[in-house]
Amino acid sequence: MAAVAAEQKKVVVHFRSTGNAPQLKQSKFKIGGNEKFLKIIDFLRRQIHQDTVFLYVNSAFSPNPDELIIDLYNNFGIDGQLVVNYASSMAWG
């Protein structure tokens, strides 16, 4: 039953550029909670037209690409959204 709820739940992902990374015209997107973090990585690579991108949740850590977005949101979501910082080069350890 929890898998069904995760499948139907959309998560608002708020992208924030860091350093010299290009800013997005639209910074908030909805994505299915059952998707893996890899989908966010691939999506952002296409949006900013760069092969190398470093992503961090809440400016703190870089999640494993296999993590489910709903799990990240449930544990680290703030104000109804998952904040993902991105950079062209490594920004945080």
Swiss-Prot record:
Keyword hit for Transcription: no
Short name of any one Pfam family annotated for the protein: APG12
Family indicated by similarity: Belongs to the ATG12 family.
GO molecular function, one term: Atg8-family ligase activity
Keywords from the UniProt entry: Autophagy, Cytoplasm, Isopeptide bond, Protein transport, Transport, Ubl conjugation pathway
Localization per Swiss-Prot or TrEMBL: Cytoplasm
Summary of the function given for this chain in its UniProt record: Ubiquitin-like protein involved in cytoplasm to vacuole transport (Cvt) and autophagy vesicles formation. Conjugation with ATG5 through a ubiquitin-like conjugating system is essential for its function. ATG12/ATG5 conjugate has an essential role in plant nutrient recycling.
Domain of life: Eukaryota
Cross-link (Glycyl lysine isopeptide (Gly-Lys) (interchain with K-138 in ATG5)): 93
Gene3D superfamilies the UniProt entry points to: Phosphatidylinositol 3-kinase Catalytic Subunit, Chain A, domain 1 (3.10.20.90)
Any one GO BP annotation for this protein: autophagy of mitochondrion
Gene Ontology cellular component annotations, sorted alphabetically: Atg12-Atg5-Atg16 complex; autophagosome membrane; phagophore assembly site membrane
InterPro entries xref list: Atg12, Ubiquitin-like_domsf
Name the UniProt record assigns to this protein: Ubiquitin-like protein ATG12
Main location: cytoplasm
